[in-house]
């Protein structure tokens, strides 16, 4: 069975088309793998066995009739942030206990319309707030990777930790994820997988539980660049239900792979060389530069002067939007309800019991920076910084730069329940240092595995592109992948 789960989406698609395997066989192989591994890895918070089998059966019937969709019979995992009709959707929070939506998110509806099969809902940081998947009400996810000669559990990154871990451990062929400040790219880098955050507005947010609405963007996590391109094509669409959705044709991203990068201008930002960055990250970056240079790309030094203000500005804008978005959870119509002596008390008791520590922290920060006395000092100033960050990128792209190459994370995956990080939220927030600028500017960014560190753990590089030019990112990421190879964890679970 494991040879079926080892297939990439592209390989499985070809075998299904050739009728060498059936969608039912493929789905059963994944369900068996999940049942065997999930107690150890905790990637899934709900497994939809019956629904998966009936979707696979319908796929087999369509294949037999010659009516196969672009993702026909491909088993996928769905981050618990996406509404799935009649299926557990709780953003991994206690406050949404028992919530099963009456509607389907646009992203998942697009995937099912193309014939994909749903295996279940994936673990994540509560309301997508976290960088280690330790804030989930359902407990942490364990990274399928371990350091050489060690049995210590590592985090898979966050907030899409379940998505990244499930893809790396072959518990789904690919997964949906979301990225508000790095939540697709950082877990992808920590697990040796590929993750792309599309341009803001490229993929619909409708039916995705909101964290910070001006920053949130859905995208795929997959085993390789080709699979990410295949998934992205199905996920992206114009959606009139999302006012930020952009009416642009969705290109065939897969067709961009293998195109030469000769003459492509790749920018290397000097501000991304941060103090205390491990030497292995700098080495990896140099390696990535060399891979692109060898393939004919032109490397240029660039400056993004406002980079150092991105993280503090992000941690004002994102919590401000979160405090507003999360005001809707009150225990009245759905989810958890804790009784109180009157309605105001019921609200307070429900929110006190329903939200976890990190979510409460961000709601309080957000409410504070939006309060009358501090709005100008914090929120307004952060929005001005955001405009300057966006302008930095615009200036660089105006000079003819096609894409920017940076590290994806400041380190490899760290230990589960790390006491230093648990006691210092700011240290945890520093995980997003290379990724938040991309969300602040609304640009596309892809994380691609580029090597292993001294302990045998995966490290990723990030490519940042011009708005709506994801094809360029797939093209350049494919070059890095071809040079670096693919990375799979040794099975311990």
UniProtKB/Swiss-Prot annotation:
A GO cellular component annotated for this chain's UniProt record is: glutamyl-tRNA(Gln) amidotransferase complex
Q: Which domain of life is it from?
A: Bacteria
Listed InterPro entries = Amidase, Amidase_CS, Amidase_dom, AS_sf, GatA
Q: Active-site positions, per UniProt?
A: 79 (charge relay system), 159 (charge relay system), 183 (acyl-ester intermediate)
**EC number of the protein:** 6.3.5.7
Species the sequence originates in: Brucella canis (strain ATCC 23365 / NCTC 10854 / RM-666)
Q: Does the keyword field hold Transferase?
A: no
Q: Which GO terms describe its biological process?
A: translation
What is the gene name?
gatA
Family statement drawn from the similarity comment of this UniProt entry: Belongs to the amidase family. GatA subfamily.
Q: Which reaction does it catalyse?
A: L-glutamyl-tRNA(Gln) + L-glutamine + ATP + H2O = L-glutaminyl-tRNA(Gln) + L-glutamate + ADP + phosphate + H(+)
Q: Name the keywords, alphabetized.
A: ATP-binding, Ligase, Nucleotide-binding, Protein biosynthesis
Query: Whom does it interact with, and what assembly results?
Result: Heterotrimer of A, B and C subunits.
The free-text function statement in the UniProt record for this protein reads: Allows the formation of correctly charged Gln-tRNA(Gln) through the transamidation of misacylated Glu-tRNA(Gln) in organisms which lack glutaminyl-tRNA synthetase. The reaction takes place in the presence of glutamine and ATP through an activated gamma-phospho-Glu-tRNA(Gln).
Provide the protein name. Glutamyl-tRNA(Gln) amidotransferase subunit A
Give, as one word, the top-level EC class: ligase
Any one Gene Ontology MF annotation carried by this entry is: glutaminyl-tRNA synthase (glutamine-hydrolyzing) activity
Transmembrane intervals: none
From which lineage does this chain's organism come? Bacteria, Pseudomonadati, Pseudomonadota, Alphaproteobacteria, Hyphomicrobiales
């Amino acid at each position: 069975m494991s040879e079926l789960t080892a297939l990439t989406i592209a390989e499985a698609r070809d075998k299904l088309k050739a009728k060498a395997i059936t969608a039912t066989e493929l789905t059963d192989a994944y369900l068996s793998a999940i049942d065997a591994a999930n107690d150890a890895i905790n990637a899934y918070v709900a497994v939809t066995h019956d629904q998966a089998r009936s979707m696979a059966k319908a796929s087999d019937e369509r294949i037999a009739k010659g009516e196969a969709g672009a993702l026909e019979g491909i088993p996928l995992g769905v981050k618990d942030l996406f509404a799935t009709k009649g299926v557990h959707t709780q953003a991994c929070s206690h406050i949404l206990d028992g919530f099963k939506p009456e509607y389907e998110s646009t992203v998942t509806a697009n995937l099912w319309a193309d014939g994909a099969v749903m295996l279940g809902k994936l673990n994540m940081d509560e309301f997508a707030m976290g960088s280690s998947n330790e804030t989930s009400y359902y407990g942490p996810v364990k990274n399928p990777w371990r350091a050489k000669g060690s049995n210590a559990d590592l985090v898979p990154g966050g907030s899409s930790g379940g998505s990244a871990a499930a893809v790396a451990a072959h518990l789904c062929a690919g997964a949906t994820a979301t990225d508000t400040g790095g939540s697709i790219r950082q877990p992808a880098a920590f697990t040796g997988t590929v993750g792309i955050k599309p341009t803001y507005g490229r993929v619909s947010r409708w039916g995705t539980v909101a964290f910070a609405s001006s920053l949130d963007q859905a995208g795929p996590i997959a085993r390789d660049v080709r699979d990410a391109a295949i998934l992205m094509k199905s996920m992206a669409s114009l959606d009139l239900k999302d006012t930020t959705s952009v009416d642009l044709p969705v290109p065939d991203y897969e067709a961009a792979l293998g195109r030469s990068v000769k003459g492509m201008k790749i920018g290397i930002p000097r501000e991304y060389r941060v103090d205390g960055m491990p030497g292995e990250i700098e080495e990896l970056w140099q390696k990535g530069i060399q891979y692109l240079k060898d393939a004919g790309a032109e490397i240029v030094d660039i400056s993004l002067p406002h980079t150092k203000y991105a993280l503090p500005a992000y941690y004002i804008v994102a919590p401000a939007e979160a405090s507003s978005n999360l005001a809707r959870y009150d225990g009245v119509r759905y989810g958890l309800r804790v009784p109180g002596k009157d309605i105001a008390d019921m609200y307070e008791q429900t929110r006190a019991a329903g939200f976890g520590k990190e979510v409460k922290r961000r709601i309080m920060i957000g409410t504070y920076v939006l309060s009358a006395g501090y709005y100008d000092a914090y929120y307004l100033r952060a929005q001005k910084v955001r405009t300057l960050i966006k302008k930095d990128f615009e200036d660089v792209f105006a000079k003819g730069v096609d894409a920017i190459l940076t590290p994806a994370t400041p380190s490899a995956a760290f230990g589960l329940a790390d006491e230093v990080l648990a006691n210092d939220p700011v240290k945890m927030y520093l995980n997003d240092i290379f990724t938040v600028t991309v969300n602040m500017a609304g640009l596309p960014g892809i994380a691609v595995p580029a090597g292993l560190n001294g302990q045998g753990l995966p490290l990723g590089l990030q490519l940042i592109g011009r708005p709506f030019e994801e094809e360029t990112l797939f093209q350049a990421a494919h070059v890095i992948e071809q040079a670096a190879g693919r990375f799979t964890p040794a099975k311990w679970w």
